[in-house]
Amino acid sequence: MSLIKFLLAPTKALNLYMVKKISFYLKFLFQVTNKYNIHSPLVYDMIENILDNSIKYYSFVGIEHVRSLLLKQTEPIELKDLGAGSKSIKSTTSTINILTKKVQSRPEKAQILFRMVSFFQKKNILEIGTSLALTTAYLSNANKEGKVTTIEGDPKVSGLAQKNFNTLKLKNVVLINQPFDQIIPQLLKNKYDFIFFDGNHSKEATLRYFYWLV
């Protein structure tokens, strides 16, 4: 499937690698032509509305303020590797600021997701891997008439995410705290038009969830 066909598909399922690929592709189009020589109205609009990062929405300020607060928090947190629903649960200790640096999507990537949801007016969004909820907040604010269902396997991380939802006063988000392999089969009856994979990053798990949901 070409990237244009993918962007036109009614259901979009992507991970951070694909977000980078889309961004690179649109930048390439802009560099080799310039946006005024692009004949496809859709591609022109995508470059104008998705790639153009000069427009900063008011919701970005609140989300990035929460990020800045998280980056200052040095409290330890015990993490459990529950993403794939593994029976052999691995535990590790980190801190909230390190978790924010390592697991959260960078602002520029999360803002591309925001612009995609806003541009295509997606209304039923599924996020696999809530983490600290910053990317979720971007998805939520992109279309406040829509609904974001987000899954987080780790109970302590899920608790932190819920606090951030409350801080940002997000009303259109449903947070589910369950291992992915347990909950995703229960969600198959729902019709999602935008799916973001940002949880278990193993190839096998990602492909399994992709084929289940798409």
Where are these regions (language model features)?
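A short alpha-helical cap/connector motif
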Residues: 2-194, 200-214
